[in-house]
From Swiss-Prot:
<comment type="subunit">
    <text>Monomer.</text>
</comment>
<dbReference type="InterPro" id="IPR003699">
    <property type="entry name" value="QueA"/>
</dbReference>
<keyword id="KW-0808">Transferase</keyword>
<dbReference type="InterPro" id="IPR042118">
    <property type="entry name" value="QueA_dom1"/>
</dbReference>
<dbReference type="InterPro" id="IPR036100">
    <property type="entry name" value="QueA_sf"/>
</dbReference>
<dbReference type="GO" id="GO:0008616">
    <property type="term" value="P:queuosine biosynthetic process"/>
</dbReference>
<comment type="function">
    <text>Transfers and isomerizes the ribose moiety from AdoMet to the 7-aminomethyl group of 7-deazaguanine (preQ1-tRNA) to give epoxyqueuosine (oQ-tRNA).</text>
</comment>
<keyword id="KW-0963">Cytoplasm</keyword>
<keyword id="KW-0671">Queuosine biosynthesis</keyword>
<dbReference type="InterPro" id="IPR042119">
    <property type="entry name" value="QueA_dom2"/>
</dbReference>
<keyword id="KW-0949">S-adenosyl-L-methionine</keyword>
<dbReference type="GO" id="GO:0005737">
    <property type="term" value="C:cytoplasm"/>
</dbReference>
<dbReference type="GO" id="GO:0051075">
    <property type="term" value="F:S-adenosylmethionine:tRNA ribosyltransferase-isomerase activity"/>
</dbReference>
<comment type="similarity">
    <text>Belongs to the QueA family.</text>
</comment>
<protein>
    <recommendedName>
        <fullName>S-adenosylmethionine:tRNA ribosyltransferase-isomerase</fullName>
        <ecNumber>2.4.99.17</ecNumber>
    </recommendedName>
</protein>
<dbReference type="GO" id="GO:0002099">
    <property type="term" value="P:tRNA wobble guanine modification"/>
</dbReference>
<comment type="pathway">
    <text>tRNA modification; tRNA-queuosine biosynthesis.</text>
</comment>
Length: 340
């Protein structure tokens, strides 16, 4: 399967640079994968598409303010570091400019409040860094770090909390699970009041989010591993939903990938944690997910491929072209799509 089959023309003016004042004010494109019907509405109306007994699955990961600007201790050269994932031997990071950082390089942030030492070189600007810091790392990041906004967002984010979901709890992501940005606490309460269950999983969004597909053949692409967790409570709720014949609806590609990683062939779950590099593209047979809320993604990205596998590639690409014609807002701060 050729990567170019997932390409589409996107005017730069449709890439949302700032979040809307009201999280629920986004537009919503609904796609009925059974009838082929497409409708245009607003995100507040998502509740009308959810049925009593359905379970909505949210990713409660929290974005770290993990973008740091420092200097090399020996030369004073400026370095940008994006922290991604904690490993046994240090933190996996992205470095700019990577050529300045080799094994043994020391980088100082905040006049030594954090010192990072390179212990391993990875490809594409990746490094493993050991961190030395005063006190608690999260406090130092809150003091020195910035939100790691995607490269297509050029404007400064005035309110850092707008790149977090209102239910973010488990710190560890390098990017927000953006489909969840549309929800407010009030909307979630209204959803629960209708008899719809809310379940939480955790998947820490990592390096794969920042890596484009660099191969021509879709099947040759290798996903980066990301850490996930599912609790006993969530596993039971999802199993009860499955056994009662109700729908499991994921909010975002991260929740989708987590559920499809954990589900057995019967679509049931067990509590667990681990690392997933699952790559979902057309031809994949879903075990667990019946419907999904998601944003509009980058051309030729693994996320467009995942979305195309829940419906059909032709249906999704037609919907994307319609969204462009209707001037929907794209990417992290953009509008949403519901595939059911």
């Amino acid at each position: 399967m050729d990567v170019n089959e997932f390409d589409f023309n996107l005017p730069e003016s449709l890439i949302a640079q700032t979040p809307l004042q009201d999280r629920t004010a986004s537009r919503l494109l609904t796609l009925n994968k059974h009838t082929g019907e497409i409708k245009h509405t607003n995100f507040k109306s998502i509740i009308d598409y959810l049925n009593t007994g359905d379970t909505l699955v949210l990713n409660d990961t929290k974005v770290m303010p993990a973008r740091l600007f420092g200097v090399k201790e020996d030369t004073g050269a400026k370095i940008e570091m994006l922290m991604l994932t904690e490993h046994d031997n240090g933190w996996e990071v992205l470095i700019k400019p990577a050529k300045r950082v080799t094994i043994g390089t020391r980088i100082s942030f905040g006049e030594g409040k954090i010192v990072a030492i390179c212990v391993e070189e990875l490809d594409q600007g990746g490094r493993i860094m050991q961190l030395n810091y005063e006190g608690i790392l999260q406090e130092r990041l809150d003091e020195l770090g910035l939100m790691p906004l995607p490269p297509y967002i050029k404007e400064t984010l005035e309110d850092q909390s707008r790149y977090q979901t209102v239910y973010a709890r488990a710190t560890g992501s390098a990017a927000a699970p953006t489909a969840g940005l549309h929800f407010t606490e009030s909307l979630l309460e209204d959803i629960k009041a209708k008899g719809i269950n809310i379940a939480y999983i955790t998947l820490h969004v990592g390096l794969g989010t920042f890596r484009p597909v660099s191969v021509d053949d879709v099947e040759s692409h290798k996903m980066h591993s990301e850490y996930y967790e599912m609790s006993e409570e969530t596993a039971k709720l999802l199993n009860d939903t499955r056994d009662s014949g109700n729908r499991i609806i994921t909010v975002g590609t991260t929740s989708t990938r987590t559920l499809e990683t954990i589900a057995d062939d019967s679509g049931h779950f067990t509590a667990q944690s681990g690392w997933t590099d699952i790559f979902i593209y057309p031809g994949y047979s879903f075990k667990a997910v019946d419907a999904m809320i998601t944003n509009f993604h980058l051309p030729k990205s693994t996320l467009v491929m995942l979305v195309s596998s829940l419906a059909t590639k032709e249906f999704i690409m037609n919907a994307y072209n319609e969204a462009v014609n209707e001037k929907y807002r794209f990417f992290s701060f953009g509008d949403a799509m519901f595939i059911y």
